[in-house]
Amino acid sequence: MTELNGIVLSRLPVLPLRGLTAFPNMIVHFDVGRMMSIRALEAAMKNGQTIFLTAQRELKTDTPTPSDLYQIGTICQIRQILRLPGDNIRVLVEGKTRALAHNFIAAEKDEDCMYAEVEELEDYVYGVTERRAQALVRTAQERFSEYAQYASRLSPDVEIGRAHV
């Protein structure tokens, strides 16, 4: 960990996502095939299983540079890694907190991965009191429960996830 103007920064491996976004308190699984992403997973597994996931600006970019990535992403905990045929890996992660990358550090050698110095961001709601926010969450849960009664193919896991919001 380093400090920049009083802000605590963590240095984490970066895994750029294409066509997918991870959020805090969300469990996501995805397949990884690019070497830079595999190296980021390996680096994270050696250092607390924590990784910074951020989206690429362009899906077609195969080897993203720091300028190809969004600065806001999610710090995630790696829960499971499965090796698949064809040198692909399926990863299960849990989003922990939103984060801002102050500095991306490109891989220096082919066997390295990209890193980022990230600052954890606080959860906040613009102009809404805590009481109002709780009321909005309750209303959303009630509406979702009503929807779930009519949805024929809704997984029980979705209802369990809703209950924990």
Give the role of each language-model region.
Residues 1-162:
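N-terminal low-complexity, acidic/polar interaction/targeting segments
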